[in-house]
């Protein structure tokens, strides 16, 4: 059985965070708008009609990235459990990938329960697996429902914390702060926004927007 590995990240996030990643597309059972599968061997992209190629999928053009994610996938598909590093304080589950079945989702719920001092969070379109365990999620595991999947109707029905991707800050509703480093994804019960295809200048734009959000001086949007 392949040995899975976390990636230690010292930039982008607030503080040191370990990422656990799986291959795009192949581990996305309920994706719709971002359903992009990358062949493990060739790196060839298979983009479903109407889908867009996200950052996570684009990274898999590199063989080392593909192999790393597929080894993780091999591990958990065969009922393996990731070994959390000893110095880990925070885990971002799936910068790439999603909960591909109920058993795998339940594994992360149990890992969170077994490690109550480790902060864990994830975006997901696998909403049925979450709803099936909605009263069993520990406080240190924060989940965010990502709009644009095949089960969006479950978000409002079960009042799930959620995120919507927008093309411009102007389109973002007043009540949604914009996340650019996962800070809002790590907070429970707050719905937020992401910007699509954000450029290098995104941080200053998002910072200005969130400053306005915090002090109540948001600019008007139609």
Where are these regions (language model features)?
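Class I S-adenosyl-L-methionine
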Residues: 1-222
């Amino acid at each position: 059985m392949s040995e899975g590995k976390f990636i230690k990240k010292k930039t982008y996030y607030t503080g040191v965070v370990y990422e656990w990643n799986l291959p795009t597309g192949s581990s996305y059972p309920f994706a719709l708008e971002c359903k992009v599968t990358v062949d493990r061997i060739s790196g060839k992209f298979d983009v479903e009609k109407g889908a867009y190629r996200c950052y996570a999928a684009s990274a898999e053009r590199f063989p080392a990235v593909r192999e790393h994610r597929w080894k993780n996938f091999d591990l958990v598909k065969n009922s393996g459990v990731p070994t959390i590093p000893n110095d880990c304080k925070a885990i971002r589950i799936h910068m790439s990938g999603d909960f591909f079945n109920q058993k795998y989702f339940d594994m992360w719920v149990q890992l969170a329960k077994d490690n109550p001092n480790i902060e864990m969070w994830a975006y997901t379109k696998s909403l049925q697996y979450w709803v099936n365990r909605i009263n069993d999620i520990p406080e240190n595991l924060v989940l965010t429902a990502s709009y644009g999947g095949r089960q969006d109707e479950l978000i409002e029905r079960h009042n799930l914390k959620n995120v919507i991707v927008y093309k411009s800050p102007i389109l973002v509703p007043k009540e949604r702060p914009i996340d650019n480093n996962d800070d809002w994804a790590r907070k429970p019960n707050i719905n937020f926004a992401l910007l699509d295809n954000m450029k290098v200048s995104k941080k200053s734009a998002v910072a200005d927007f969130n400053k306005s959000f915090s002090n109540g001086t948001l600019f008007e949007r139609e």
